[in-house]
Each structure stands twice: as C-alpha cells, then as structure tokens.
Amino acid sequence: MNTPTQSFRAKAAIFSLLLLSCMQCHAQLSATFYDNTCPNALNTIRTSVRQAISSERRMAASLIRLHFHDCFVQGCDASILLDETPSIESEKTALPNLGSARGFGIIEDAKREVEKICPGVVSCADILTVAARDASAAVGGPSWTVKLGRRDSTTASKTLAETDLPGPFDPLNRLISSFASKGLSTRDMVALSGAHTIGQAQCFLFRDRIYSNGTDIDAGFASTRRRQCPQEGENGNLAPLDLVTPNQFDNNYFKNLIQKKGLLQSDQVLFNGGSTDNIVSEYSNSARAFSSDFAAAMIKMGDISPLSGQNGIIRKVCGSVN
C-alpha cells in the first residue's frame, strides 16, 4: 500500500509528464521546423503568393482573411480548405465564407510546388500561415517570423464556422468577447481589424449602414457608397474597405474610422465612443505602432490550437484528406 508521500510523488510525476508533454507540443512550432527537411519551402511559397498578388492585388486581402477564418474554427489546421464530401461538411459553405472566401487555388498551387521538392513534408496549415505573412509584405504591410510545424486536420466544421467567426454587424462587446475566446486581447482585435486597410466588401454587407442616415457615418461617404450599392439588388457589388488607399497596407483604415468612414458596421464600432477609441486614435497617428501590433497579433493568431507532433496529418492535396 502506498504511503501518502509515495502517492504525492506519483501524482507529482504524472503532473510533470503532462506539463512536459504540453510544453513539447508548443515547442514543436518553430521557425526552423523545415530547415533540414524542406529548406526551400518558404521561398517556394513566397514565389506563388507574389505571382498571385501581382496578377490581382486584392488577393493579398483574401489570403489574410482565409488564414483568419481558418484559425478561428478548430484552430490553424487548414480545415477551411477541405472540400465537401459525404463525411465532411465543408466550412467553405458556411455563411461567413460562402461566395466570399477566396484564395483556395493559390494555396493549392503553392502546395503543388512544395510537393515537387519535398513530398509529404509541409502541411497546408503552414502554407496558409506563411502565405498570409507573405501577402501582407507584398502590399507594403509588415512581415514577421512564422512559427512552423502545424499539421492538417482530417475534419472541418461548418457549424463552428457559423458560430465562431465574428460578423460584419457585430457590436463592439461581441467582437471583444469573440476574440477573447481565442486568446486574443482587445488590442489584438483592433490591430487585426486593420487588415481591412486592403480588400473589398459586398454591397449587402454594408447597405443598411449607408442608408441608415445614422450619426456614426459621414454623409458624403455614405452618398458616395450608394452609387455602387442601390437599396435593392446588386448584392454582390464590391466596394473597397479603405476608399483612400485600397491596395496599400497602411494605417488609413484607422484615419477613416475617425472620420466616420468605416465601411462595415463592425469597422465603425471600433471608434464610436467605446473602449477601443484610444487604440484607433493611436494607430491613426502611428503607422509604426499599427504595423508592429498587427504582426504580433498575427503571430498570436497563428498559435491558436495547432495540431502538431502525431496529431493530424500532412495532406497531399489541401482540399481533401489523404
């Protein structure tokens, strides 16, 4: 029969093993993960991303958004890339992604090129994470060191995509809680929202705002947006999220908010007399502060619940399970 001391030691040993296992799981994400197994992986991904963005500047925003929508559902596991099958209800068909999520082909192209030099080594989850970083850099935004070693999921969740992703009509408190549930601070949330310095939105997402005659929108801005977004029909018409420099990653997005020229309701709530006004003001005055915080927040987002070690797989094709 174990004595109390022996029992305590046994429990302590088990706890230590569990703690070590957890630490090793996180330690498996490393910037040097592919240095020996696929040293040219990052250059190969960068080439694919740059080619895509040189053909269509908007693709930079699409790739950053794709990474964001991946990480917020099951973690950064490339689940958003999986196609519909009898056993997989694809996240592509979820309302936040249907008809708006783009860049799948770019990730597949990058994966195909990487497979040519290192078959079965680099995950789609890592390719998507690196592509988001390279997309930012390609349009004048910050770059950062990406930790690598994620593995790919064998499942997807349309349900979680429809419940966990923040929406364009969300009030500030819901945005804050949504990001907090993923381990991201309010400051992270505001910085990541700054990705709307590039990209476009469909008419039906901002129609109510520009026809509301509300006090939180500049009348001239609303009038300009109405030209391409009538009160009825033309739901898919696009408008830039940043009307001033729509293809350049900068801090004009925050300057627009101060002028009540945020396109989406979820943009303008960041500067509307609430707790995030001071952060928006700071970023509007300092492109350096925004750039630094955006990079830091992207790194944190890339750490959301990754599969590593023996968990998950390395997909051969990003849209399907091996």
UniProtKB/Swiss-Prot annotation:
Q: What are its cofactors?
A: Ca(2+); heme b
Where is it predominantly found? secreted
Which domain of life does the UniProt lineage start with?
Answer: Eukaryota
Q: How is the cofactor bound?
A: Binds 2 calcium ions per subunit.
- Do you know which Pfam families this protein is assigned to? peroxidase (PF00141)
One GO cellular-component annotation of the UniProt record comes to: extracellular region
Q: Which residues are reported to be glycosylated?
A: N213
Q: Where in the cell is it found?
A: Secreted
User: A GO biological process this protein is involved in?
Assistant: hydrogen peroxide catabolic process
Which pairs are disulfide-linked? C38-C118, C71-C76, C124-C318, C203-C229
Q: Where is this site: Transition state stabilizer?
A: R65
Instruction: Identify the residues that bind substrate.
Output: P166
Question: Which residues of this protein are catalytic?
Answer: H69 (proton acceptor)
Could you say which EC number(s) this protein's record lists? 1.11.1.7
> What CDD domains does its record include?
secretory_peroxidase
GO MF terms here are:
heme binding; lactoperoxidase activity; metal ion binding
Primary enzyme class: oxidoreductase
What does this protein do, in the record's words? Removal of H(2)O(2), oxidation of toxic reductants, biosynthesis and degradation of lignin, suberization, auxin catabolism, response to environmental stresses such as wounding, pathogen attack and oxidative stress. These functions might be dependent on each isozyme/isoform in each plant tissue. Plays an integral role in secondary cell wall biosynthesis by the polymerization of cinnamyl alcohols into lignin and by forming rigid cross-links between cellulose, pectin, hydroxy-proline-rich glycoproteins, and lignin.
Q: Which family is it part of?
A: Belongs to the peroxidase family. Classical plant (class III) peroxidase subfamily.
- UniProt name for this protein: Lignin-forming anionic peroxidase
Q: Which organism is it from?
A: Nicotiana sylvestris (Wood tobacco)
**Source lineage:** Eukaryota, Viridiplantae, Streptophyta, Embryophyta, Tracheophyta
